[in-house]
Amino acid sequence: MQILTDPRTLQQTCLRWRADGQHTVLVPTMGYYHSGHESLMSYARSVGDKVVVSLFVNPTQFGPGEDLAAYPRDLERDAALAEANGADILFTPQPADMFPAGHATWIEVPSLAGTLCGVSRPTHFRGVCTVVMKLFQLAMPRTAVFGQKDWQQLAIIRRMARDLNVPVDVVGRPIVREQDGLAMSSRNIYLSTEERAQAPNIHHGLALGRALVQGGERDAAAVAEAMRRYWRESLPLAQEDYISIVHPETLEPLARITDAALCAVAFRLGKARLIDNMLLAGE
């Protein structure tokens, strides 16, 4: 495995691969790997000829007062895990490499970015879209792999690629969970022992909502209220950011649950902001 830091070197390498007809798969990450990241890399290895894993804590997707400085980092460990999971290149640029002085171009998908996480993080997805598009231009992948835990991010990147005619297949892979149901996240390290004990109830509440829908409940407000009641009792240390039942592609709020519905939630639990989601209907 090569470790590259220079964007131009990455681009030249990937240009050679493309000229040779190689299928490059990109796995964009911010590092501090867990089994969820490893599952993305393993999938990439299974479908591609070449695998590029990017590791970049992107400052443009953090807002004021967020955890940019505190975000966990362990490059040596991450490099070992990337290599063990089949990466051909680990791309680890510095912020000045990706956003040099004078950078003035930003990409946004306002119709999808202004809801859910975008309400409390209004500039987040602008930073995500811009860095992902830059990575697409550098790695020139045929496929890019993202986790479904960040469902809104996945929907936005898919729309960006479709609207801008980007020839990349954007693949979403299932959430990887701890044995007790907590969605794996690099930010779980922020949780205290007591907070960690409560955190799996986020998943359990989502499962409650799905069970209600499977049992015949179709009123989205009723399902959301049942989940909210459960979380009030089971997450006394948490502060609700949002609980929303939306269409999984358009992210538009639903009043009635019919063929496709996603419940997406975010809670602040101590120093951690935890997101999770579950399809209540549809595949």
Curated annotation (Swiss-Prot):
CDD domains recorded: PanC
Keyword terms: ATP-binding, Cytoplasm, Ligase, Nucleotide-binding, Pantothenate biosynthesis
Pfam families reported for this sequence: Pantoate_ligase
Family per similarity comment: Belongs to the pantothenate synthetase family.
SUBUNIT field: Homodimer.
Name by which UniProt lists this protein: Pantothenate synthetase
Taxonomic placement: Bacteria, Pseudomonadati, Thermodesulfobacteriota, Desulfovibrionia, Desulfovibrionales
HAMAP family: PanC
Binding site for ATP: 30-37, 147-150, 176, 184-187
Annotated NCBIfam families: panC
Residues binding (R)-pantoate, per UniProt: Q61, Q153
Binding site for beta-alanine: Q61
GO biological process: pantothenate biosynthetic process
